[in-house]
C-alpha cells in the first residue's frame, strides 16, 4: 500500500504554528488574517527586521531555529524506552495551505525513517529563538504500514533553555495507563512530573506547572487593606487555586503580594482568542475606566451622583451619558473597550438596551415578573419549596438568637384565594427565597460600611392555578442594635398596588433583589462555578496524561477557566475590587462565599440532585428524567434536565468505551491519583465529607465527570449570560441598599410619599456604582466570536477513536434537538413563565449562539 521504504526514506511532516507577535494584543487590533508575512507588513512595515530573535517574517522559523525529533511508539532503545530519531529542522514555509486558521502559518519538515524505527508516537521540539511561539499541530503523512499521524498541540514553546526536560508532544491516540505502548511509558510519566513541578519557587511566565495554594492574595496588608486567607482552615474553608509562589507581604507573612497573577502558560492563550479581548476588557475596566468614571462625575459636577428618575436611568442606553472630551478620548483608544462602550461621536457614552426593558419599560415592576425571575432569571437555583411553617433558621441561637420567621399564616392567606397555609403546604404550593442565614452573620458588619443599610430577606411565594408564582410576603430582618445574640428586628411587608404601601412593597422587593444579586454573584456564580472548578482543572493537568481518555473528555471544559479566575483575583474579587465596590457585602464579599462553601456538596451539583434537595422535584420513575417537577413550568429546570440528560448520556457512552468494568476504574493509576488529589488537596477543607464519590465504580466516574461537565458548561451559562439582559436595568436588579424602609414621620418617609421614584433611587445602587456594575456585567454577558459551545470541539480530530467521535456526534445532534424544543416551549402561550410580562423568552440554556450579547449559548467552559 505504501510501497517499499529503504533506509534513507523520509517522512513528510507539516507543522502549524503562530509567532508571538501575531498574538500580541495591540497588534491583533490592526492586522488581517494573512499569517506571519501579513502581520510583519502590517505591524512593522515592509522590510523592517528586528534583532534578538523577535519574529518578523516566516523565514525566522527556518534555518536551525526550530528542531524536532520523532519518538517511536513501537521500537525501543537499549533502556527499553521509545527510540529517539535524528534532530531535523523546519524546511519550507507553506503560505497557502487551505486548512490554516486565522494568523496561522505552516511549514514542511522531513524526518529520516527506516523500518527499525517503527511507528512514531511522540516528538521532541526545541526552540532556539529568543521568543516563544504557539505550536498548533503537527501532521505526519504516509507513515509506512500506518498512514497519517496527527498531533494536536496547542501549546506555547519557549526557548529550550527555559525547560529542564525537552518539550514533548504525544500522538492523538487514547490509552489508559495500562494500555500505553511500552516504549512511551517513561515519556508519559515524565511529562506529568514536569507539569506537577516540585512545589517550590516563584512561578515564571514560561512555566507550565500546576500546583495548589490557598486564596491568600486577595488583600493588600501592606497597604492597610487585608483580607482573610480563604482555604486551609475550618473557619474559612475554600477551594484551592493555582499556586504562584509570589513574594509574601511584610505585614502578613502568610499573604502574597498583590500584582500580576501567574497562570500556567498554556492556560493563558495570550491574545490568541477573541475571548481574550473580553477578559482584557475587565482588566482595562478595573485599571483605567473606573477612575475615569469617577473623574467624569466629578468634572461634570452632576446635580448629584444620583439618578433623579427612572427615565434618568433609562437614558444610559436610550440617550447616553455626556462625558468630558478628555475622558472619552482616554477610553476610546482601549481596543478591548471599543465594542463595550459605544459612542456617537459627540462625547456620549451609551450602554446597549438590556433585554428585560426592550419590550416593556415597566414590566420589571410587576409581582409576576419579580416572581418569574426567581425561576427563569439569572439566579434560578436558590428557591426552595416551603416544607414547614413558620420558616426556621440553621444559625446558632446562642450567637444569633431566635431567627424563626415572624411571618404569620394570616398575613399569607390574605392573597391565597381561600387556600390555607396547611393546604398549600400539603399540595406543594408554597415556596421560599431565603437569604436569612446567608446574610444575618455579616449584616452588622455590612451595615457599618459607609453607605450600606440592608436587611436579610425572606420571601414567601405561592404557586397559582395558572402555573405562575406570586409573592405573598417579604420579611426584612436586621440584627438587634444591642447585639446579634438578641435575635433580629423584623418587619413583614405585604403586596400593595396603591399609595405609599405600593412604594414600600416595591422597596421591599428591591431589598430582596439586593440580597439576591450579592448571593448570585458571590455564590451561585463565583463560588459554585468558577472557584469549585479550578481544583479539578489543576488535578486533571497534574495526573491525567493527554493520552488519557478522561483528560480528552474533560479538557475542553477547563478552557480559559484558570486564566479568568486569575484575572478575577486581580481585578474583580480582590480588596477594593469591582465586586467589593458594586455589591452589598463590600469587603466581606468573598468571606461570605467561604461560609457558604462549608455546606457545598459535590454530588448535589448534579441538577436532578439539586432539584430534589430544594424540594422542587420528586423522584418518579414514570416521569421524564425520573423526576416530577413541582412547578411544571420552571424554565431553568425543564431545559436544564434535558441538557443534563444529554451530558450524562454522552459521558456514559464515552466512559463505557474505556471502562467496561468497575475493576478498570479501580486499576487506573492516573485516574485514582487524579481523584484522590482533587478531593484531598483541591477541596482539602472538605476532604473528610462522606458524600465524595469513592471512584471505585464506573457509575462513580460517569456521575463525577457529568457533574464537572454540567457545572462548567450549562450551570455557568445559566447564571452568567443573563447578567446584563436582566441586570443591565439597575432598577430591576439593584446591587446595593443604602436606606432602610423609611419610618413614618421621617423626612425620608415624606419623600417616599411625594416622590416614590426618587425614594427608590436613593435606596438602590447610585450612579457611579451603576456605571461600574453595568460595564462589568456587559463584558461578562458577552460571547466571543470564536466561542466553542457544548457539543463542539476546537479540533474536530481531537481523538482517533472513531467510536468516541460517533458518540460525540450523537451528543451534538441531541443538543440541537433540545434547541428546537426550547424554541417551541417559548412559543407556547400557556407556559407563562417562559416569557413573562417583560416578554423575554428564556433562552439561557439554548446551546448555540451568535457573538455578543445574545441571552443564550452554552460554552464548553467557564471562560468569562
UniProtKB/Swiss-Prot annotation:
- Region entry Disordered: which residue ranges? 244-264
Q: Which cysteines are joined by disulfide bonds?
A: none
Q: Which UniProt keywords apply?
A: Cytoplasm, Dioxygenase, Fatty acid biosynthesis, Fatty acid metabolism, Iron, Lipid biosynthesis, Lipid metabolism, Metal-binding, Oxidoreductase, Oxylipin biosynthesis
Gene Ontology biological process terms from the UniProt entry: fatty acid biosynthetic process; lipid oxidation; oxylipin biosynthetic process
> Which residues are listed for Fe cation binding in this entry?
525, 530, 716, 720, 864
The record's subcellular location field reads: Cytoplasm
| Cellular component aspect of the GO annotation | cytoplasm
Q: Which family does it belong to?
A: Belongs to the lipoxygenase family.
Protein name as catalogued: Seed linoleate 9S-lipoxygenase
- What organism, scientifically named, is this protein from? Glycine max
